[in-house]
Structures are given as structure tokens and as C-alpha cells.
Amino acid sequence: MLSINDLNMDVILHLLTFLTDKNKLNFMMTCTHLYQFISCVKYNNFQLFDKIRGLSFRNNFKKIIYFKEIKERENKNTVFVLKSNRDKIPLGTTCIKTGRYFNFLEMGVIPEGIISLEFCEYFNHTLKKGHIPETVTHLTINNGFRHMEKGSIPNSVTHLIFGENFNKMIDVGVIPNSVVYLKFGRVFNQSIKNVIPHNVKYLSLMYSFNQPISEEIYIDDTLKTISYIPKSVKYFDYETSNDEFDFKILSENITYLNIIINKHIYPGDIPSSVTRLGLLSNEDVRPEAIPDNVTHLSFDLYYFGNYSLNQLIHKNITHLNLGDLSVSCDRIPNGVTHLTYNPKYLTKNSIPNSVTHLTINNKIKGSIDRCIPNSVVYLNFNGTYDNIIYKGDIPDNVRCLIFGNNFDQYIEEGAIPNSVVCLNFGKLYNKPVNNVIPNNVKNLTFGYEFNKPIENAIPNNTNHIEFGYMFNQSLKNSIPDSVTRLVFNYGLKSIYKINKKFMNNIPKTVSVILFR
């Protein structure tokens, strides 16, 4: 007489396809012979990731429910808050932040294996050599420390950040040569002479800094300017409005320059090596002052003088961000492909046909009908934009359409073209969407306030949908079978949403549900 153990493996696996996940597991746990198939079977019902994460065959589960915290624990290093020297740091911890009342550091308190370390702003103790292990690569020092001894920051540190309120004198040699990323906070205003090591590639000096960054000395009877900024620096962020700033101190190795300056800018001032330039000035910028190699320009000027934007911007610039500056529509040069600005109004042909990516940051006066060229494929109505959208406002070739957080206006039926595949409604949007979403949208995002019925509103081509915190509508017959991923931003109330009624309204095609 045959027993079940005599059945062919393919036959057993075929029989298991007719069972629910629970019955599959119960069946295979009846004997050791069947248990060997546990990693060969596919499981089709939704399971909480936290329950299956430790299983060797967890990849066999086709449908998984994630919570943000679970996913972050899986993919990121957990930060351990160290409150006292007596705290037991869990094995495997790689990131530590000292707590508010942690104010005394002894040797060995921070163990080997820590990669990221942050001292809170209340820490007020002398930092000595050996306090920080040689495994730390990322170090953040806030407004603490009576003093930092030479050698107290180990040679393993590559990224060093001084917090927003840090304003202590740093001795020569304290910052090791291993540091390549160095950022000072907004109130730092101490001398940096011989402080910055020669291997730093990224350097940031912020608002309050008003110290010399160079000096003139005689070398062989010749007066020369000596820069405190190493020639190794390639990314220089200087946002201080220091009137004594001298462009001559900038090396030809700098490729990214972001600067706030209150003086005239002449041709030759900015190094020719710069390819990305952020510039804020309330003084005159002369034509040809921007080097030919610059392709990305953020140009927030308070004062244009006698020169137009076309005179200041050369043909090699493809990415142009005008920040809060309001510029006449006809001043945008040809050749710009990525444009961000704040026009007061738009007219036909005001934006050149070279623009493919357009971000508008403010509310425009009047109609924008046929004003945006068909070359635009990415359109972002950002910031305060809050105009009604009519047919003709959005060109037919736009593929990605984003409405900013302030947008909450009606959208005329057919106003969003069928070319759009990615559609994002902003935080405040809470209007009906029936006959609004075009048929080809694959990725759809609703903001925080959206809470309208979506039955018959979602097209059959949509794959991914994200809902905001306020959404509380029925999903029954509302999610098309094309959807494979759902995201719900319910925060702490997420756990109360998982029930039989809720899950029964989820299409079988959905394989991932994320609550966050």
C-alpha cells in the first residue's frame, strides 16, 4: 500500500498549491519527509514582515506588509542614545548619540566597532586622546567640550561636522588629515588658520563666520597671498557675507562653489574649474564673470545693475535656478534645460523650447494656457503655486507632474494629458479626482489632507499608489488589479488598519503594503 511518502516531489508541491499558507505549514509539519519541502513552496497570503524576517525561506512569501520602523531596522543602523557611562551598549551597535545628561567621558566608554558618533550640545568635558575609538568614521560635535586635545579625534574620522551652535576655538592639529568632509555650523566664528587639514575635499563655512581666510606675507621679498583654504577642496560652501573675501584665495581645483558675497564680481574672479555655481549677491555681477565651464547655476541676485540675464548667462549653462528672484519672462536664455524660478506671469514663447525640466515656485498672475513649451517632460508646481488647472495649461509631453504642498484647486477634466505616468498631489490637495487622473499614470501619490472617494477614479494602468494621513475612504472596488504596491502614511494608527475587512478590499495583484 502506498503512503504519502511515496508520492513524487512534483505531485506534493502541486497539491500544496491548493492550500492556504496556514494549511501548507500545518501539512508539512506532520513529518520530517514533508518538512523538507518548506523552503520549496511559495506562500501567497499577506504576512507581517516582522513575523517572517527570521525565516530562512522568507523570500518565498509573495505578499508582505511592512511597517516603516521594521523596514528601517532592517536596512539602517539603529542609533543608540548613551545616557551615562554605566549604560550597556547592545552588541552590534554602530551608531551612538550621547543623551542630554551625559556629561562625563572615560576611556573605553565608547567601544570599538562604533562607526558614527554624535556628542550632544550639553556635553561639557575635555575630549582626550583615546576617548573616541579608531573605528569611528563619522563624528558630529555640537556645542560642547571645554577643550579638544590634539589627537582626540582619531585618524579614522573622514566626516566631521560641528553643530549649529558650536563656537569654540580649535587648536592647530586637532582635526586629523584623514578628514575629507568638514562642515562648521551657523554660529562658528573662530580662526581657521592652519586648522583645516590638507586632504579636505568638502568645506562649509556658514552665516556667522567673519574671520580672515587668507593673509599676505613676504616670501623672498615678494608679497604673496596665502590661503587658509587647502588646494584639496573641491566643494566650497561659503555663506557668510564676509566683506574681506578675496577671490584670489580660491584654487583651480574647486568644481562646486556656493557663495554669498557683498562685492562686485568681475571676469576672472571665479575659478575656471567651477562647474556648479551658487551665487547670492547684492552687488553688480559683470558680463563674462561666470566661467565657461559652469553648467549648473543658482543665481539669486538682489541687484542686476545694467545687465540682463542673457548677458550674464553663457550658452553652456543647462541648469538654472533663480531662487526667489523674479525675472522677466523673456530673459530666460536658450540652452537651459532645467529651469527653476518665480515668474510673476507667463506668456507664450517666454520659456525657451530647450527647457525639459521646469519648476515654478510661486503663484502666477493670469492664465498659463499654452505658455509652457511641449519640450517640458518634468513639471513641478512648487511652493505657493495654487492656480486652477485648465486644459492647455500642461503640455502634452509631460511625463512627471508634481503639485506643491500649497496646491488645492480644481483640475478641469482632461487638463492633465495622457503622457503623464507619474502624478503627485501636494500636502493640502483635497478635491475630487474622478475624471482627473489620466489613463497612463503608473505612480500616483496623494498628500496629507486628501480624503475623497476614489471609486472609478484610479486608471487600470496604475502600479503604485500612496495615500496620506487623512485618507479614510473605502477601498472596495476602488483599487484596480494593475496595482502591485500600496503605501499608507497613517503613522501610529497604522496598526489599527490591519483587519479582515481592510485586507479583503486589497486586490490579489498587490504584493507589498507599506505602513508608515
From Swiss-Prot:
Protein keywords: Repeat
Superkingdom in the source lineage: Viruses
SUPFAM superfamilies for the chain: L domain-like
Placement of FNIP repeats on the sequence: 123-165, 166-208, 341-383, 385-428, 429-470
Pfam families tied to this protein: FNIP (PF05725)
F-box domain segment(s): 4-49
InterPro entries in UniProt: FNIP, STK_FNIP-Repeat
PANTHER family hit by this protein: FNIP REPEAT-CONTAINING PROTEIN, FNIP REPEAT-CONTAINING PROTEIN-RELATED
Name of the protein in question: Putative F-box and FNIP repeat-containing protein L414
